[in-house]
């Protein structure tokens, strides 16, 4: 899985 957050 690839997850991006700020």
Swiss-Prot record:
Family statement: Belongs to the cutinase family.
Signal sequence bounds: none
Catalytic activity: cutin + H2O = cutin monomers
More details: On the 2D-gel the determined MW is: 40.5 kDa.
Subcellular location, principal: secreted
Lineage of producing organism: Eukaryota, Fungi, Dikarya, Ascomycota, Pezizomycotina
Keywords, comma-separated and alphabetical: Hydrolase, Secreted, Serine esterase, Virulence
Keyword Secreted set for record: yes
Documented activity regulation: Inhibited by diisopropyl fluorophosphate (DFP).
Entry GO MF terms: cutinase activity
Protein name: Cutinase 2
Localization: Secreted
Cellular component, GO, one term: extracellular region
Catalytic activity, EC: 3.1.1.74
Function: Catalyzes the hydrolysis of complex carboxylic polyesters found in the cell wall of plants. Degrades cutin, a macromolecule that forms the structure of the plant cuticle. Allows pathogenic fungi to penetrate through the cuticular barrier into the host plant during the initial stage of fungal infection.
Factors inducing expression: By contact with cutin.
């Amino acid at each position: 899985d690839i997850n991006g957050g700020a």
